[in-house]
């Protein structure tokens, strides 16, 4: 089958002819319709320090997708040939304390599709049936293909009550922008997103941010005055992984504020712990999606009118995957979709 793989420990992704994955008793086989390129895939393409420590080479990569079930293992119940599905990219052990308590997103033994085992940049993907999520008929293939990153945004944004709250989002990447859309949709008052990328800040405005702030050109404190804010932000969503952005967020938070952190710093960072202690801030780390409550919330948000369409900015056939990676690496894109249909 046709697939995109990391073949060598160097920059790049390559189109290969790969064996079709074998189906286990508890697995489903998915014929991929559309894939999306994740920031993780860009890290793997660039072969940065994280990738070098994490990715076994060769490896078929990718974990954002939608497709159709074409084969079902003999022990699988609840799915049928022809079902349209996406899937949870973290495959959990099922026997650790968190798994047995229903907190599978905190599994200490999780492995990643397209990271530790063959992924979805391929004509066919095999995953445990447990990991599959059936897509409602009134949700498009394109939106279903980005459920994985959308789930990160939903998990982060819905960590705290947002109704009537002032929200600060650090980082206008695709996940940060989708989080802004979620916050506005569920009733936040002001949703302010910060970055230094003018293209993505403009896209964040289209996604519903009250104010998109280029922190290289204007002060966050001035924006707060402009919005009539006198006590700081109630909710912070850290999506950037940038130490300077997190420090600025701590300063801008109201006493008793709550912060959800999804962004991963590239190296250890220092902060003023006095900001946390004396303000009584609550900080929550976010990893992946809650299985499968986040997935149900994603569907419900879209079905209730949440518009994510502006986030998809580029579409290419899978044979043009290099153009897709070039767009993602340029920073001048939202989500990039790769189509697997016949030309």
UniProtKB/Swiss-Prot annotation:
Its EC number is 1.1.1.103. The record marks 148 as: Important for catalytic activity for the proton relay mechanism but does not participate directly in the coordination of zinc atom. It holds the Pfam family ADH_zinc_N. GO terms for biological process: L-threonine catabolic process to glycine. Binds 2 Zn(2+) ions per subunit. The active site is at 40 (charge relay system), 43 (charge relay system). It catalyses: L-threonine + NAD(+) = (2S)-2-amino-3-oxobutanoate + NADH + H(+). Zn(2+) 1 binds at residues 38, 63-64. One of its GO terms (cellular component) is cytoplasm. It is found in: Cytoplasm. NAD(+) binds at residues 175, 195, 200, 262-264, 286-287. Pathway: Amino-acid degradation; L-threonine degradation via oxydo-reductase pathway; glycine from L-threonine: step 1/2. Belongs to the zinc-containing alcohol dehydrogenase family. This is L-threonine 3-dehydrogenase. It comes from Pectobacterium carotovorum subsp. carotovorum (strain PC1). The lineage of its organism: Bacteria, Pseudomonadati, Pseudomonadota, Gammaproteobacteria, Enterobacterales.
């Amino acid at each position: 089958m046709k697939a995109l793989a990391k073949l060598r420990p160097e920059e790049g992704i390559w189109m290969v002819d790969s064996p079709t994955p074998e189906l286990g008793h508890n697995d489903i086989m998915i014929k991929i319709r559309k894939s999306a390129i994740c920031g993780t895939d860009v890290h793997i393409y660039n072969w940065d320090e994280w990738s070098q420590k994490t990715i076994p080479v060769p490896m078929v990569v990718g974990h954002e997708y939608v497709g159709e079930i074409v084969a079902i293992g003999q022990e699988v119940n609840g799915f049928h040939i022809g079902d349209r599905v996406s899937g949870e990219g973290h495959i959990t052990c099922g026997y650790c304390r968190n798994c047995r308590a229903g907190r599978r997103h905190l599994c200490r033994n999780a492995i990643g599709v397209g990271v530790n085992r063959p992924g979805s940049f391929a004509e066919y993907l095999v995953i445990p049936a447990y990991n599959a999520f059936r897509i409602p008929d009134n949700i498009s293939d394109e939106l279903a293909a980005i459920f994985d990153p959308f789930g990160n945004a939903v998990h982060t944004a819905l960590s705290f009550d947002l109704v009537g709250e002032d929200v600060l989002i650090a980082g206008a990447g695709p996940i940060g922008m989708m989080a802004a859309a979620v916050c506005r949709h569920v009733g936040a008052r002001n949703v302010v997103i910060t970055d230094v990328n003018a293209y993505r800040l403009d896209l964040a405005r289209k996604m519903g941010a009250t104010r998109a702030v280029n922190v290289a050109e204007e002060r966050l404190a001035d924006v707060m005055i402009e919005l009539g804010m006198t006590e700081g932000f109630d909710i912070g969503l850290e999506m950037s992984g940038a130490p300077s952005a997190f420090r600025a967020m701590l300063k801008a938070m109201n006493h008793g504020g709550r912060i959800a952190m999804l962004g991963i710093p590239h190296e250890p960072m220092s902060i003023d712990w006095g900001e946390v202690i004396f303000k009584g801030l609550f900080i929550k780390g976010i990893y992946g999606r809650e299985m499968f409550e986040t997935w149900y919330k994603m569907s419900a948000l879209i079905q209730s009118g949440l518009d994510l369409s502006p986030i998809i900015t580029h579409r290419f056939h899978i044979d043009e995957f290099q153009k897709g990676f070039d767009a993602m690496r340029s920073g001048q894109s939202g989500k990039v979709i790769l189509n697997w249909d016949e030309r």
